[in-house]
């Protein structure tokens, strides 16, 4: 969203060293594996990232989380937001995970995904953060001692001034957070305008679409010829998937009709090294310019069975370790264009590949860009896809988009 709005954007993996200078960019993203980390670790990492960004002269801070508000009763959205509000001394922050282009909307405080209430969208079966309540005021209230209010649709639909006034009233009433309704991109733009003076904004990536214009209006955003331009990198193509979302399962179903697909079976082989070896052996004569797909994705029933045998945390760690090892093996064998499906999977893969920074390019589908990845390993074209994002043909479309770029 920031790149689309004209901001050159670089994403850093993990908290940078204290003495590392910020990259030459209009927006810097510090990516943390904080969604399912222990609360204390998530808070500490987030505060360390904040401190580094403050040292670099950042003007505004954005705590980005999933558009499906992925979290548990313990957090980590509430505890991290609390820590950031306290550290910045701002006393208040809006919370808006809406991303209408990807069918994530908030109405009367209820989050909808794909036209269904969040708890009826498939997210109730998420293997790590099952979402069983669509009322975000309730969900966030369970994660924070701060009071949570609502800026409802009728207010949002009246525009930025009405939104700003409503948030001011909520803060004066002692609310620490405001869930903000949004069902259209126009609403997100208005929310962004209303939050121009806020030190902290929290939400999904969608609400960021309203922010670049604030900086442009303030005269601090330079004109860029093409903020999405990336270096061109040739090499073999591959997809690795760990997400078990309905969207990813549908994308895999489509891919099976067009490219080779290998399915990992951690129920039969609950050993990450063995799963990795089997997948890489299968791929040995298939790596090339045409995509191949290796997936650990499974139905909710299979996920539940694996978790019952191994435990939720161990089952998740097994899949992440296997998929990350497979990605590393594919890169060793010449893959330079890689798509990764799944949020936790993406973090595991980026860590295993030694990725330190991602220059953000143009979008394949809304919310999913190609990036140019660099770090301790080979440079890569890398697309990290949230499990619930992307059209059905995403795994093939991604490489068509790359070929079409000049």
Sequence positions of predicted segments:
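Short acidic, glycine/serine/threonine-rich loops at helix termini
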Residues: 1, 73-77, 104-112, 162-163, ...
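N-terminal basic/disordered segments at the start of proteins
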Residues: 1-24, 42-45, 98-101
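Cap/lid and interdomain-hinge subdomains that line or gate substrate/regulatory clefts
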Residues: 10, 26, 42, 50-188, ...
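A structural-propensity feature for long, helix-poor, extended segments
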Residues: 21-34, 287-289, 372-406
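Short glycine-rich or small-residue beta-strand-to-loop segments that form or flank ligand, phosphate
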Residues: 28-36, 59-70, 181, 238-239, ...
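Conserved, well-structured core segments that form the ligand-binding/active-site neighborhood
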Residues: 114-279
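C-terminal structural cap/anchor segments
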Residues: 283-341
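Conserved, well-ordered active-site substructure
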Residues: 335-336, 344-394
């Amino acid at each position: 969203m920031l790149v689309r709005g004209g901001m050159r954007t670089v994403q850093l993996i993990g908290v940078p060293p204290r003495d590392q200078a910020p990259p030459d960019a209009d927006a810097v993203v510090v990516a943390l594996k904080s969604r399912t980390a222990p609360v204390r670790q998530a808070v500490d990492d987030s505060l360390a990232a904040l401190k580094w960004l403050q040292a670099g002269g950042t003007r505004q801070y954005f705590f980005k989380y999933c558009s499906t508000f992925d979290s548990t009763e313990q957090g980590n959205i509430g505890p991290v937001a609390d820590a950031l509000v306290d550290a910045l001394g701002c006393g208040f922050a809006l919370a808006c995970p809406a991303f209408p282009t990807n069918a994530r909307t908030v109405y009367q405080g209820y989050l909808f995904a794909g036209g269904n209430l969040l708890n009826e969208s498939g997210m109730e079966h998420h293997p790590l953060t099952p979402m069983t309540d669509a009322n975000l005021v309730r969900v966030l209230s369970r994660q924070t001692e701060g009071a949570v209010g609502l800026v409802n649709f009728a207010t949002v639909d009246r525009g930025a001034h009405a939104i700003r006034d409503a948030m001011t009233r909520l803060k004066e009433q002692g609310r620490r957070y405001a869930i903000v309704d949004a069902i259209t991109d126009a609403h997100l733009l208005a929310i962004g305008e209303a939050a121009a003076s806020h030190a902290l904004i929290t939400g999904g990536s969608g609400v960021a679409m309203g922010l670049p214009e604030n900086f442009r209006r303030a005269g601090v955003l330079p004109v860029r010829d093409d903020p999405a331009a990336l270096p061109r990198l040739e090499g073999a193509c591959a997809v690795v998937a760990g997400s078990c979302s309905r969207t990813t399962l549908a994308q895999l179903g489509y891919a099976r009709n067009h490219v080779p697909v290998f399915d990992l079976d951690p129920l039969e082989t609950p050993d990450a090294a063995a799963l990795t070896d089997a997948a890489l052996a299968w791929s040995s004569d298939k790596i090339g310019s045409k995509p191949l797909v290796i997936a650990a994705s499974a139905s909710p029933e299979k996920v539940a069975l694996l978790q019952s045998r191994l435990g939720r945390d161990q089952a998740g760690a097994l899949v992440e370790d296997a998929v990350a090892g497979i990605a590393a093996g594919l890169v060793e064998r010449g893959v330079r264009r890689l798509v990764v499906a799944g949020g936790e999977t993406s973090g595991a893969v980026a860590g295993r590949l030694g990725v330190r920074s991602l220059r953000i390019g143009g979008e394949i589908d809304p919310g999913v860009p190609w990036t140019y990845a660099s770090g301790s390993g080979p440079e890569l074209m890398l697309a990290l896809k949230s499990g619930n994002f992307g059209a059905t043909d995403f795994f093939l479309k991604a490489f068509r988009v790359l070929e079409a770029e000049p």
